Amino acid sequence: MNFETVIGLEVHVELNTNSKIFSPSSAHFGQEQNANTNVIDWSFPGVLPVMNKGVVDAGIKAALALNMDIHQNMHFDRKNYFYPDNPKAYQISQFDEPIGYNGWIEIELEDGTRKKIRIERAHLEEDAGKNTHGTDGYSYVDLNRQGVPLIEIVSEADMRSPEEAYAYLTALKEIIQYTGISDVKMEEGSMRVDANISLRPYGQEEFGTKAELKNLNSFNNVRKGLIHEEKRQAQVLRSGGQIQQETRRFDETTGETILMRVKEGSSDYRYFPEPDLPLFDISDEWIDQVRLELPEFPQERRAKYVSSFGLSSYDASQLTATKATSDFFEKAVAIGGDAKQVSNWLQGEVAQFLNSESKSIEEIGLTPENLVEMISLIADGTISSKIAKKVFVHLAKNGGSAEEFVKKAGLVQISDPEVLIPIIHQVFADNEAAVIDFKSGKRNADKAFTGYLMKATKGQANPQVALKLLAQELAKLKEE
């Protein structure tokens, strides 16, 4: 029997506000344990939460970006559970009226077609703290993360393969990143994914029993975990077994999912309205104001890059993968850069440098201005493409003017025949054996002189001019 895979994803996104959702403590990542806390985070008796308006702004922005309806009479609820990293013994979240609902985004499938994935809801909530277990037998609680604002985005179970899940996460991350409400860095915990997967016989409308996958710390691991779970469930069903509702974690080493716990039913968190926070009236004017702040999104930019700049769909997708790169490209083209040349550099040398240095394009010295300046120096023959790579590395590390560095470093390309011809003659004099081979008609003997000439000029000879002059002087040499 063949089975259809059914996947839904729950994505927690940490919002990049300066302060926490209900307290004035800093929400910044990477501080000393419990440095970003105050009496509200520690839940001292008598303290009350105060709503951070910036979090609501971010929630509205996310809802609009994900084509969602907005609950304009919004409220919060208490989600009751006990855990050491949750000092209140409840989490302030949203239950029956999330800020956003009934949304969708489009993903691109492997065959180039597009598919709409529905989004059930997006709700605001506070993050919990973090437990660490020491080698001394004690467990320690760090409440820096307690109260950091989150938006949880819950998809409908519309994905039918691990690849579709991967495409959905990629598209969702791009959209959220473009809004500016989060840096969506999984390695820092600002984007976390739980996956729900079940199988059902083709043609059956009712969902099968699902398993929830956790410990998915990268998009690749989401895909790998789903692939393994898909195979595991199919094997169980084909052997006559039944799938239990359970939570499993993905083991990165083995590539397998491992049982954490069996769920006997839905967790009862005894939700009830948060009594310490008022209802929030999100007016049409408020929504319209946030709408004005929305950027041009990746899909719109890709279409523009293909139609207006003549780039391929692949190039357009690569350039819009991050807003920073896309903004860089647009500014470079706006100041006169050739779109294809700028695209080639951003996808080639620039991308390699960023990967090797583990940096983003905003963190290096390269700017749209000095990249366009460098490309112009290549176009007018001032420097060769080979020399340009050296210039690029300098600009990336130090910034500044491309033209000034080229002049200061003596990297200007040699194009003057009166300079090149004496160098060619010296190459002949320094390589008598190669001259003898060439005169005797040895096959490909002329090719060696190209390397000798470039070495003699330290790569600064203009290739087109140099090769033409070299052919001319070799012809004379043969006649001697």
Curated annotation (Swiss-Prot):
Keywords of this entry: ATP-binding, Ligase, Nucleotide-binding, Protein biosynthesis
Organism name: Streptococcus agalactiae serotype III (strain NEM316)
Pfam families: GatB_N, GatB_Yqey
GO biological process, one term: glutaminyl-tRNAGln biosynthesis via transamidation
Family: Belongs to the GatB/GatE family. GatB subfamily.
Origin superkingdom: Bacteria
Assembly information from the UniProt record: Heterotrimer of A, B and C subunits.
Higher taxonomy: Bacteria, Bacillati, Bacillota, Bacilli, Lactobacillales
Gene that encodes it: gatB
Any one GO molecular-function label of the UniProt entry: asparaginyl-tRNA synthase (glutamine-hydrolyzing) activity
Name this polypeptide is given: Aspartyl/glutamyl-tRNA(Asn/Gln) amidotransferase subunit B
Reaction equations catalysed: L-glutamyl-tRNA(Gln) + L-glutamine + ATP + H2O = L-glutaminyl-tRNA(Gln) + L-glutamate + ADP + phosphate + H(+); L-aspartyl-tRNA(Asn) + L-glutamine + ATP + H2O = L-asparaginyl-tRNA(Asn) + L-glutamate + ADP + phosphate + 2 H(+)
HAMAP family in UniProt: GatB
EC number: 6.3.5.-
